[in-house]
Amino acid sequence: MSFWTQKKVVVTGGRGFIGSHLVERLLEAGANVKVCDSTYSNGAMNDLATRDVEFHDRDLADPENCRKICRGADVVMHLAAKIRGVGYNVKHHGEMFFSNAVMNLNMMEAARVAGVSRFLCVSTVGVYPKDCRVPTPEEDGFKGEPEESGYGYGWAKRQAEVQARCYKSEYGMKIAIVRPYNVYGPRMDFNPETAPVVSSQIRKVLEAKDVLTVWGDGEQSRSFTYVSDEVIGMMLAVEKYPEADPLNIGTSEEIKIKDLVQLIVRLSGKNLQIVFDTSKPAGAARRCPDISKAKRLIGYEPEVRMEEGLQKTIDWYLEPAAVVR
């Protein structure tokens, strides 16, 4: 019998990109799922409308809402977060810190009071400083300051990790902490103002006529995690390592931005001239997680290679029924 069979699981942020995929995987594993979310991100839950999922629209800044949603739950998986684009983040560090810190504090405390058996704290790679080692081990998460572009958000997530450690120490609460790494796949954000690298480049390629302009020289490298690998990692962490100790959930497969763009162009069947604008910011030279800890402790092993994941994402974007913002 699966760990998840008949478990009553609350997923906050379950209408969103990663959350909706997690809900699907939990249902397949035999869990009874309750989704709490105040948004309808990308219509991500449309294809689950007929499934046996209980939906709640709740503001998690209200402690009483959090207590209500946690009552009777076996597991709480807290994915809800206020996330915006870099341009917004750099002007609203206080708002990003407060909004996320309040949700994290409320949900973990509500889960503790409800006596849930497991809690998932979803952190971020934004906890890492700009000068962290690459591949980046988990212990670098509290060295120096979070990157300036996501300073408020990064500190809110660091605070959540500290809260998890404190709750494990005093209350013996079983909490898993994961740090997702550049997740992509169907239902991700394609809004030009807020889209991350993969969806931004897919949209630009598919909408381009003859010339595609890419910021920077394209030499910077990143690793990207397909969403199905990410949610499996989250579930494994809850099941096997609820020790309030962070795990990188990503992939060690790196790709240069110029190669990523060329791959998207090839998969989309377009014939474009690619121009690199070196006057524009390109970000850090290299970003990649050390996932050896997750491999060792929970048996995590990413399975979807970049080309396969990109093709699935492009195919979804081109579907007439896809809801794209």
Write out the residue ranges for each language-model feature.
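NAD(P)H-binding glycine-rich loop region in Rossmannoid oxidoreductase-like domains
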Residues: D57-S99, A110-V113, K130
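Active-site helix of classical SDR
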Residues: G152, A156-Q159
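N-terminal Rossmann NAD(P)H-binding glycine-rich loop of SDR-like oxidoreductase domains
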Residues: V9-A29
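SDR active-site strand-loop-helix element
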Residues: T12, C36, V76-K82, F119-V125, ...
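Conserved glycine-rich Rossmann-like NAD(P)H-binding loop of the short-chain dehydrogenase/reductase
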Residues: A31-Y40
